[in-house]
């Protein structure tokens, strides 16, 4: 099966916990998993993509890398994005959105950089199909991600859709809700697994539970609910 370069972003400080989780979910790809700044990168298959989207409690998304190119200036960014075979991944009938992050990027405007990527995608689609896709910044059907470094750009397509912290059980956000992925990171940092050293059930106490996110996340983990 074709190997893919995957990147799972997470909050700073969670990388080591996410690495251990990824290696447990995808043992066949465990050797390739590497801790990166702000996430974990690995080489995997579409089966791994499905498993990670279903079972990861710490990742924010599961991204497939489509390009890694030199990018010293905005024109190089356009060329890098224009060379990607976007037509293999979606059609002009689908809406899309470009999300961009950066670290030590020399560009003056990240908004302009995102527009250059958008223009490159639309231009390539128009060249291939005679029409261009529309941008939807609220509920896009396809999410593209770019990360800009000092002199390189990483281009990804998102396989998750909605962020993975949206587990599907929360009907009301309440005041200042804790993201489920952050609650999972707190549980991972505590070392709680649901069982003690003798294999007996181990309670978890959250005296400041608020809307109960930590407790619910712990219960789902203990019951192995995806």
Regions found by a protein language model. Give the residues of each.
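Non-catalytic nucleic-acid substrate-recognition regions in nucleic-acid-modifying enzymes
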Residues: 2-142, 200
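Generic beta-structure capping elements
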Residues: 45, 101, 149, 156-162
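Short loop/turn segments at secondary-structure transitions that flank enzyme active sites
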Residues: 48, 104, 152, 161, ...
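Beta-sheet entry/capping signal
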Residues: 143, 152-154, 201-204
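Conserved S-adenosyl-L-methionine
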Residues: 178-226
């Amino acid at each position: 099966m074709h190997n893919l370069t995957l990147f799972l972003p997470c909050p700073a400080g969670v990388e080591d916990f996410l690495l251990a989780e990824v290696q447990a979910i995808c043992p066949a790809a465990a050797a390739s998993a590497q801790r990166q700044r702000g996430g974990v990168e690995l080489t995997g298959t579409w089966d791994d993509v499905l498993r990670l989207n279903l079972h990861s409690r710490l990742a924010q998304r599961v991204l497939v890398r489509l390009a890694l190119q030199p990018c010293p200036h905005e024109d190089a960014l356009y060329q890098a994005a224009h060379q990607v075979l976007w037509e293999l991944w979606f059609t002009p009938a689908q809406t899309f959105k470009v999300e961009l992050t950066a670290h030590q990027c020399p560009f003056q405007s990240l908004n302009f950089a995102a527009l250059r990527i958008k223009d490159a995608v639309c231009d390539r689609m128009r060249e291939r199909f005679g029409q261009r896709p529309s941008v939807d910044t609220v509920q896009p059907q396809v999410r593209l991600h770019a990360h800009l470094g000092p002199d390189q750009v990483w281009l990804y397509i998102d396989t998750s859709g909605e962020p993975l912290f949206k587990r599907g059980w929360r009907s009301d956000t309440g005041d200042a809700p804790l993201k489920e992925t952050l609650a999972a990171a707190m549980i991972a940092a505590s070392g709680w697994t649901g069982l003690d050293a003798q294999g007996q059930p181990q309670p978890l106490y959250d005296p400041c539970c608020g809307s109960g996110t930590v407790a619910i996340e712990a219960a789902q983990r203990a019951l192995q609910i995806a």
